[in-house]
A protein has these predicted regions:
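ATP/NTP phosphate-donor binding region
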Residues: 1-72
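Gly/Ser/Thr-rich loops at beta-strand to alpha-helix junctions
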Residues: 11-15, 78-83, 110-117, 257
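Long, hydrophobic/aromatic-enriched structural stretches that serve as scaffold segments
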Residues: 67-94
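Structural motif
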Residues: 75, 110, 249-253
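Short, acidic/small-residue loops that bind anionic groups at enzyme active sites
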Residues: 90-124, 128-136
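Hydrophobic structural segments
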Residues: 121-124, 210, 215-217, 243
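Conserved anion/nucleotide-ligand pocket segment
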Residues: 128-215
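Internal helical hairpin/lid segments
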Residues: 222-270
Length: 270
């Protein structure tokens, strides 16, 4: 049973901005309603510019959360596009390895999108993670409650420390166009979901998941977003080896960038 959650901003520092204060307040209240204590790590609420310009402080927040014996879960605030910049501050002097070894209990690490890079960093050191909800995108949902599918799995994770079975949602939702405080309590437009599309193989399978956001993983091999992604990811050997992938369920999700089919194919083939 999860009791204490550490909130970290390892990518964008959005939750420190005034324009999302109403969402953040909703999310913090929801976590408390789940019976959770919330620890906001020192730099998580510093805002977009500060967080962007201080990757070392982001890394320090992660290390502190891992070492904090009161913390049961590390919840990422939101994605972004540059959490790869934490690599030198986590691996150059074995900082992350030592923090994991120092921690006396297993912690849940949760997030998605650019957080893929953090998942791969932790995977590299044998620290199992869960690819799932982020604080701002999911817990802070502006409807009167979290979306049912999202809430179901979040509750299962905080109550049991695991996810037993993943089934498709009955519905899918359109993204909001109004994120202002006046939109609090309004429902998203939803549509019936037809479920998973089976291309080949057995319809039911089990195993460990490895993967994440396609654009983030593509950045490991492409410098078009930032000039140093390839060099940093190569230096610290971030991408999993062929042996790591053996027997895993490949997870790929695309971001709000909505790549066209040609670019999608290029990213997958890379």
């Amino acid at each position: 049973m999860i009791k204490t959650v550490a909130l970290v901003s390892l990518s964008a520092g959005t939750i420190g901005e005034d324009f999302v204060k109403h969402e953040v307040n909703i999310g913090l209240k929801r976590l408390e309603q789940f019976g959770l204590n919330v620890k906001i790590m020192p730099h998580a609420m510093k805002g977009i510019e500060y967080v962007k310009n201080h990757p070392k402080e982001r890394a320090n927040d992660l290390l502190a959360a891992i070492c904090d014996e009161e913390v049961d879960m590390i919840l990422c605030a939101i994605g972004g596009d540059d959490t790869y910049r934490l690599l030198p501050y986590l691996f150059e002097n074995n900082e992350l390895k030592e923090a994991i070894e120092k921690a006396e209990k297993r912690k849940i690490f949760l997030g998605f999108s650019d957080t893929t890079m953090n998942h791969l960093m932790l995977h590299k050191l044998g620290f199992g993670t869960f690819y799932g909800q982020s604080f701002l995108a999911d817990v802070c949902e502006m409807e009167d409650d979290m979306l049912p599918y999202t809430k179901k799995f979040f509750e299962e994770l905080i109550k049991t420390g695991n996810i037993k079975e993943i089934v498709p949602s009955d519905v899918w939702y359109e993204e909001r166009t109004d994120w202002s405080e006046s939109a609090v309590g309004t429902e998203r437009t939803k549509h019936e979901n037809e479920g998973f599309q089976l291309l080949q193989g057995k319809p039911v399978f089990a195993g460990k998941i490895l993967g994440g956001c396609l654009e983030s993983m593509y950045d490991i091999f492409d410098n078009s977003r930032y000039p140093d992604t390839i060099s940093l990811c190569e230096k610290y050997n971030l991408f999993p080896s062929l042996e790591d992938w053996r027997g895993k369920i490949l997870l790929l999700e695309t971001s709000e960038e909505q790549p066209d089919p040609k670019h999608y194919r290029k990213m997958v083939e890379t």
